[in-house]
């Protein structure tokens, strides 16, 4: 069972180097790395050359846009399982071995998702369900993020490309939720995806340093996808009330930067949901 790992990257060198080190430490060796390099210079060439003899690396050049870069990578896959690591995540040494074993033992399932944690093993990159179970359109927001998703090749062959209007660098207001949109489409096509919270990938929690414009952009992406996939209003209201509650709590406790974060999240979700020209 071979893995195709699609790494879209721009602006990072040391993070990419550390990720490559984590790949080199994998106990399971049947994988290829497809690097979609969106830099305008050769900053990655030396470190890619350093690992080229350790495992297969395919270095592609492409313009900006996370979804566009991943779609370019999808054209080159040859593996049985496809994943989308972030350029600042780290794989634990036994990760691919664990995922390969799970797919071998669960031939009736088409995808596996895990959880994001910091290097101190605390949750990062959002809220996560504690219990394992099937992914559905309602819990998908708490059961997967791009770099914790593993899909059989059949899924990507059926679902197709990421929506290039969504995601960081898309040049649109919708700066997130491209992977959630992808999973919802996969579920709609009848594929079965499972969430295992013990499957963890290390990723820094950068919430405090994210710009408020980026926060709004992330919120707009979520709002856009909630509307596109016709979620019921009670569900939409839940995801509007959460940041509103965060605003109130942060104001009471005097955490004004946190208050601003939650407020901009709320504004973004509202603007994304009520955007003109919404597609369903």
Residue locations for each model-derived region?
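N-proximal low-complexity "stem/linker" segments adjacent to membrane-targeting elements
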Residues: 1-25
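Non-catalytic, C-terminal membrane-associated alpha-helical segments of glycosyltransferases
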Residues: 213-221, 227-280
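Cell-envelope/extracellular polymer assembly enzymes that use nucleotide-activated donors
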Residues: 2-4, 32, 181
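A short, conserved alpha-helix in the catalytic core of glycosyltransferases
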Residues: 146-151, 155-159, 166-199
